[in-house]
Amino acid sequence: MNKLNSKRIDWLITLAPFIIIISLAGVLFAFPNESNTIISKVRYFFGDTVGIYYLIIGVAVLIVSIYLAISKYGDVVLGEPNEKPRYSFFGWGSMMFTCGLAADILFYSFAEWVMYATNPHIEELGSVAEWAGVFPLFHWSFIPWAFYLVLAVAFGFMLHVKKINRQRYSEACRPIIGKHADGILGRIIDLFALFALLAGTATTFSVATPLLAAIIVKLFGITITCAVYTYAVLHGFKGISFLAKLCIYLFFGLLLIVLLIGGQGKFIIENGFQSLGKMLQNFIELSTFTDPGRTSNFPQDWTIYYWAYWMVWSVAAPFFIGNISRGRTIKQTILGGYVFGVGSTIVSFVVLGNYGLGLQVSEKTDFISQYVADGDLYGLILNIIDTMPMANVILVITVLCMIAFYATSFDSIAYTAA
């Protein structure tokens, strides 16, 4: 059996991305200044020179998702024509939401409004209270989930209708590249996909893990993630489904506590409702804003960066979503994804983001000055939580929620990569 499994391992696809990443890490460590210069130029090229194409792709993929949902293709079942979904709507939505966002959503829900509040573009638009809560909803809602859902139904169709079990991007590209999917071109596509997957995973760890570590050290002084991760791996999709449901209960429990006992409930609801309205009212303008005069570089620094970020995560999350969507129609997958994915994301940013923003607007504390002074977002989030009643309880729930998010999302990635 081991010999059979070893023959199935594509060592080139498996090892090459790791070798490339280790080599790049060595170069970055040995030549930090030169590497920083090169990376800055690469970032400028993709964010500024060709950034418009990211915006165009974002709008296009949203339109495609809507078309697939409302057209005749929406009735196509991802599986046999009369097949029923394998998971309940709640279980399916929980897995999709947690695998698609990881623990980043908690970090950004608490802190992203502060970064916008210090951006010159906000001053061009109006007040911090009006706009700092709008952009998180825009950058984390419809277009990001459109990236996931369009590819998810494509991969689901490939896996469950065409019965093609090779979960590789080269296989997904076969209708376009034909027999070259089995050749050098297919290998190159798979190498790029796996490299992007590893890079995206590293980015996610680098963003939210310091917050997780800071909370754990403050509360316990130990790391407790290994047992949770091992449980999910050993129990496969059932383990992932259980962790996803647990994560959702913790997640919405956290939001409910902050909303009801944090003391900013009225502001959270009113400003959240207003921010959602502003986002929908200005959605087309926000989606196509390029800042051609480069007065603020806001779309280059934020919107284009985020669209690139979601594209990288589209290497893994859509395969997993497509896999668990067996038995659902294309319409159910897309619209259900928007309802559960976008809905949960918006609620998170509205509640957690507007809690801190409410304290800032009411001048009960000055988080913006703190961020400007030291740039420490992790310390800022801890300070935000410390202003809440039962702060230690909320810290415990937050850390458990982050662990569950990480375990679910990276287990799903492990299954996809395997």
Positions of the model-derived regions?
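Flexible loop linkers connecting adjacent transmembrane helices
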Residues: N2-L4, I38-R43, I70-F89, V114-F135, ...
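C-terminal transmembrane helix pair
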Residues: G343-V350, V396-T416
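C-terminal membrane-solvent junction of multi-pass transporters and transport-like membrane proteins
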Residues: K7-A16, D75-S94, G265, E270-F273, ...
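Membrane-water interface regions at transmembrane-helix termini and the short interhelical loops
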Residues: N2-K7, E34-F46, S65-R86, G133-H139, ...
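Membrane-embedded translocation segments of transport machinery
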Residues: A181-L185, A193-R328, L335, F340-L395
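N-terminal alpha-helical transmembrane segments of multi-pass membrane transport
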Residues: M1-A129, A146
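Membrane-interface segments at the starts/ends of alpha-helical transmembrane spans
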Residues: L4-K7, I39-Y54, S127-I143, L219-G221, ...
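Helix-loop-helix module between adjacent transmembrane segments
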Residues: N5-R8, L12, I19-F29, L62-S65, ...
